[in-house]
Amino acid sequence: RDGVINKDNGYVFQKEKFVWRKNIFKYIKKYNDNNYFVIIITNQSGIGRGFYKESDVKKLHKWMVNKIRSKGANIDKIYYAAYFKDSKIYKYRSKRSLRKPSIGMIQEAKKDFNIKMNQSILIGDSEIDKQTAINAKIKFRILNFKSKLI
């Protein structure tokens, strides 16, 4: 999410601090129109670190999905990993397999949507995203707003 859908300003959990990436609605719509599921997988260690609550992220994600829909595009689902190894809350330090570059969120999406991995693309902006795609054995595309869509 951060760096792809919105500018990565560090631990974004409020819509007031959320800055959309230029042309992102058009990019999402292009994938919708080409029959891809558009699923966001995002590390949100700020929850595990105690910087904000899970409810804050859920509220922001609901707002994001509604805004994207209002622009004629669609997000099928958002998965997030709240994992932080030193979290004071056990559930946030016990699900490391969900945090990218592990593929737990991808495996959940595969199961939930019956996704064919050989027809999937992970679009990201970081080495962690690239490694996640490698680990999941799916194609990776670095986000480049100057390149052609798809």
Q: What would you call each of these model-derived segments?
A:
Residues R1, T42, G124-D125:
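Active-site flanking residues adjacent to catalytic metal/cofactor-binding acidic residues
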Residues R1-I39:
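Active-site neighborhood of HAD-like aspartate-dependent phosphohydrolases
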Residues D2, Q44-S45, S102:
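Anionic group-transfer/hydrolysis microenvironments
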Residues D2-D8, I39, Y79-K91:
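Short, basic/glycine-rich phosphate-binding loops at helix/coil junctions
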Residues I5-N6, G46-R49, K85-S87, D129-K130:
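Short, active-site-adjacent cap segments at secondary-structure transitions
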Residues G10-V19, Y52-S55, Y92-R96:
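Short glycine-enriched, charge-decorated loop/helix-capping segments at active-site entrances
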Residues I24, I28-M64, A73-F84:
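Substrate-recognition element of Asp-dependent hydrolases with the DxDx(T/V) motif
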Residues K58, K62-D76, D86-L122, S126-I150:
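Asp-based, Mg2+/Mn2+-dependent phosphohydrolase catalytic module
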